[in-house]
Amino acid sequence: MTENLISSTIDSLDNQSPDRGKTALVLGGGGARGYAHLGIAQVLRDAGIEPDLVVGTSMGSVIGAAVANRADLDGMVKVLTRLDVNQILKISQESRRELEKAIGRSLVREFGVRRRLRGETNDPPVKLARLFTFFKLMTKNSSFSELPIEYAAVATDLETGTEVIINEGKVYEATAASSAIPGFIPPVKLNGKLLIDGGVVDTVPIL
């Protein structure tokens, strides 16, 4: 079924006129399930179809950054398919999604939890420095202005609970902010805001 859907999408794009406007690849969250984005992106690339814009949230922002940077998707597939974050954390897809939403709603109301995530109390299990190092390597430490394909990441403002679109500055910071799972990864301070996983407010971003 997925193969038929991808095939139909490719045929539809091939048949569109040159003045169709911009084509956007929108990648949502979903933890380990987000790895499927890599396969779709690779199929589109193999078909010679490149989006004008890539938008991602949570795991989708990680894959989206790679697509926008024209990274080696085959190499990423080999690395990421060996990892299953949800399995390691013993959290099902449904539970993780509900947990993110519940924690996210709580975070924007409870100042004490915000203090904890700022690092004023116990540290979350994932160190931000390690995440930054990984995303720096993955994105070649690129700035948004250096990307060959236009890209935007979606994050959540910890203070207000509102959606934040990031499309300037360093790509690794935006990707880290968009995928900062509440309670597991510290929020990312960017442009004066504390940002967490974009999936809290928008699982599939539409700009």
Task: List PLM regions with ranges.
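Patatin-like phospholipase
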Residues: 1-57, 65-207
